[in-house]
């Protein structure tokens, strides 16, 4: 009985919103605090979800997007002009990849696809060893990209950007600013 009384005196349940963005279901929770009412929390959570959706669609790795247009140009050996936002994301992702000795590298989109992790239905599979060796021999890396103003070129046609993991981090940073 004492536990029930203490539980009743605890914090009120947070306000929540959920959606499917970047693949899995995400949930946004806003704790009650001074000066924040349910309407303000709802507006902020809606703004976060709109930003998540915008990022998801603008930089989608396999559905038509600004990112797939860049990947197509890289594969063809062409330079490609990108938005200021994408240029900034690429520079930031290059710094993060370099800081970790390229162990986390958004330039390995072909490998991600080969393992079955690019698609509306994820079908993880063991890749054909020959195909895998061919892709590994290309050594694709976001470090192969060169930026001149907002024009991107690549010294490696095997680079395919997939911002999946990186963009989730960017989205969380933006959510923190909004909330």
Task: State where each predicted segment sits.
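A contiguous, well-ordered beta/alpha segment that forms the leading edge of an enzyme domain
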Residues: 5-164
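Cysteine-centered nucleophilic/redox motifs
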Residues: 156, 160, 165-179
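Sec-dependent signal peptide recognition
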Residues: 1-2
């Amino acid at each position: 009985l004492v536990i029930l009384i203490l539980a009743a005196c605890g914090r009120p349940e947070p306000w929540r919103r959920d959606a499917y963005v970047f693949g899995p279901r995400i949930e946004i929770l806003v704790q009650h605090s001074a000066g924040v009412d349910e309407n303000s929390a709802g507006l902020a959570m809606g703004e976060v979800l709109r930003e998540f959706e915008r990022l998801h669609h603008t930089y989608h790795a396999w559905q038509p997007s600004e990112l797939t247009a860049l990947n197509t140009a890289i594969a063809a050996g062409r330079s490609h002009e990108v938005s200021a936002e994408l240029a900034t994301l690429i520079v930031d992702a290059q710094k993060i990849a370099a800081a970790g000795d390229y162990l986390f590298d958004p330039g390995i989109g072909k490998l991600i696809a080969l393992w079955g992790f690019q698609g509306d239905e994820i079908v993880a599979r063991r890749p054909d060893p020959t195909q895998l060796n061919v892709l590994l021999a290309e050594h694709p890396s976001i470090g192969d990209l060169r930026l001149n103003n907002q024009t991107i070129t690549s010294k490696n046609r095997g680079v395919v950007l997939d911002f999946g993991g990186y963009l989730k981090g960017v989205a969380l940073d933006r959510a923190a600013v909004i909330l």
